[in-house]
């Protein structure tokens, strides 16, 4: 991807949403990460965990209501789909850290190949993600809905995960 070194600085959707989350002290323990999952329609789709839903076609104009929803102050006002597959995120954020930029694509390819070989494509989706933290442990793999984080993943040990 061509994510800048810090996806949270700028005037795009991701930066604006992240700033709104940071500025609201009533949204604790929330992390915003970009991934290369394509949006189903126009706007931005948001994979929301642990809710296990994909919010569909969210725009800049939706951010105030999204913040209210994240704070549980309003019911979900957005179109959404249940996430029925496991989601694996592999950090491949080259501009943030070279280690993830080098390890990530190899791990991503190996995970995709393993899923295909095990005929699990109907159960798992794999995406490259922006910075997940802990780049000294690259390759980093995060699995949802379990929320398990794995570090130092490499093509030779992918099948363990």
Locate predicted features.
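Histidine/cysteine-enriched polar flanking segments
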Residues: 1-161
